[in-house]
Curated annotation (Swiss-Prot):
Cellular component, GO, one term: cytoplasm
Essential cofactor(s): FAD
SUPFAM superfamilies associated with the record: FAD/NAD(P)-binding domain, NAD(P)-binding Rossmann-fold domains
Inducing factors: Down-regulated by heat stress. Negatively regulated by SPL.
Domain of life, source organism: Eukaryota
Designated gene of the protein: YUC6
Organism: Arabidopsis thaliana (Mouse-ear cress)
UniProt-recorded name of the protein: Indole-3-pyruvate monooxygenase YUCCA6
Keyword Glycoprotein: no
Subcellular location, record wording: Cytoplasm
Reaction(s) the record says it catalyses: indole-3-pyruvate + NADPH + O2 + H(+) = (indol-3-yl)acetate + CO2 + NADP(+) + H2O
Metabolic or biological pathway: Plant hormone metabolism; auxin biosynthesis
Keywords: Auxin biosynthesis, Cytoplasm, FAD, Flavoprotein, Monooxygenase, NADP, Oxidoreductase
Coiled coil (residue ranges): none
């Protein structure tokens, strides 16, 4: 990929009717274009840099890891031990705790970007990306403060990930409640201090919902938790080590169902019978359910103790909302001052990527499941869609960099001939 190739491509684009009719700046990129500067995008850019390949990283926000920096609550820690959340090549600092804080994780990512000299193009919203059959290249249209830019590249990496857009459910009467009280997604929630003395309903019983309830409790709020579906709650640590680390170790030697049975027996010994608290367990074990559906078990950091003491109340699903009131599926009605939606996030790939083979239009995930979903056709790649957190993204980043490097070397050999 040299200067001559770039000039040749610019020559072709000079006679392209799209460039003539559209007031946009055209940028020919010799390396890959990566969409998204979260941990997945940074990991991919770093792995490419290690192999001598420079990429262009497009990020719609004004900072790296915008989900972590702008849309997470203050008390957040990594839910898994740091060794399972490291990006490729550079580990966490040795003096970081087992479960780094939100700010420590951000510092790690910023240092990671500095050490690899990764400088994303910020405030760039990718509106579309499509493969041009005539050019044999991807055309990525991005809108920023200085107008529209079209990036033309051979390789395109979708790194916007699983958590690009908040999932906001609609309940009957939501507008009426919002007119009198507060309704916000966890992406706008920072601290329970904003709700001291308030009656708050938290919708969603995943790790975020559970931890937000605990945070509200610690600041003197009166939280209730909507639990509509069955959920696995495990202690964050068991037998003197992390539950996740112990699970990964046992899976090397035992079948998944036997490991699940072990986890549930130990969890019951430590936490008690969660069904007595209104938290029914799914039929499948926690690890098997994670593999099949991607649904992550909750790692308890103190919320169950508050449920047992009655400081956090467990409620059934919501039927409808009224002004200051919530009617539940069991027919009960209660008053609340605020509702926090801990209802997760979704992929936004279908909104900008114009292709029909690699990504599902339904959920925005690769159609091929892990570990096969990282590579598509025509130089298209995906990172951060494994449903296996940062460790899964790191695995894909390494594969992508190696694959692009292989193509890069082949091109160089052809030119020498």
């Amino acid at each position: 990929m040299d200067f001559c190739w770039k000039r040749e491509m610019e020559g072709k684009l000079a006679h392209d009717h799209r460039g003539m009719t559209s007031p946009r700046r055209i940028c020919v990129v010799t390396g890959p274009v990566i969409v998204g500067a979260g941990p997945s995008g940074l990991a991919t850019a770093a792995c490419l840099k290690e192999r001598g390949i420079t990429s262009v990283l497009l990020e719609r926000s004004n900072c790296i890891a915008s989900l972590w920096q702008l849309k997470t609550y203050d008390r957040l820690h990594l839910h898994l031990p740091k060794q399972f959340c490291e990006l490729p090549i550079i580990p966490f600092p040795g003096d970081f705790p087992t479960y780094p804080t939100k700010q420590q994780f951000i510092e790690y990512l910023e240092d990671y970007a500095r050490r690899f000299d990764i400088k994303p193009e910020f405030n760039q919203t990718v509106e579309s990306a499509a493969f041009d059959e005539n050019l044999g290249m991807w055309r990525v249209t991005s809108v920023g403060e200085e107008g529209t830019t079209e990036y033309v590249c051979r390789w395109l990496v979708a790194a916007t990930g699983e958590n690009a857009e908040p999932v906001v459910p609609r309940f009957e009467g939501m507008d009426k409640f919002a007119a009198a009280g507060v309704v916000k997604h966890t992406c706008h929630y920072k601290t329970g201090g904003d709700f001291a003395g308030k009656r708050v309903l938290v919708v969603g019983c995943g790790n975020s919902g559970m931890e937000v309830c605990l945070d509200l409790c610690n600041f003197g709020a009166q939280p209730s938790l909507v639990v509509r579906d069955a959920v696995h709650v495990l202690p964050r640590e068991m037998l003197g080590t992390s539950t996740f680390g112990l699970s990964m170790f046992l899976l090397k030697w035992l079948p998944i169902r036997l490991v699940d049975r072990f986890l549930l027996v130990v969890s019951r010994f430590i936490l008690g019978d969660t069904t007595l608290l209104g938290l029914n367990r799914p039929r499948l074990g926690p690890l098997e359910l994670k593999n099949i559906s991607g649904k992550t078990p909750v790692l308890d950091v103190g919320t169950l103790a508050k449920i047992k003491t009655g400081d956090i109340k467990v409620c059934s699903g919501i039927r409808r909302l009224k002004r200051h009131e919530v009617e539940f599926d069991n027919g009960k009605t209660e008053r609340f001052d605020a509702i926090i939606l801990a209802t997760g996030y979704k992929s936004n790939v279908p909104s900008w990527l114009k292709e029909n083979k690699m990504f599902s239009k339904k959920d925005g995930f690769p159609i091929q499941e892990f570990p096969e979903g990282w590579r598509g056709e025509c130089g298209l790649y995906a990172v951060g869609f494994t449903k296996r957190g940062i460790s899964g993204a790191s695995m894909d980043a390494k594969r992508i960099a190696e694959d692009i490097h292989k193509c890069w070397k082949q091109d160089e050999q052809v030119k020498k001939i």
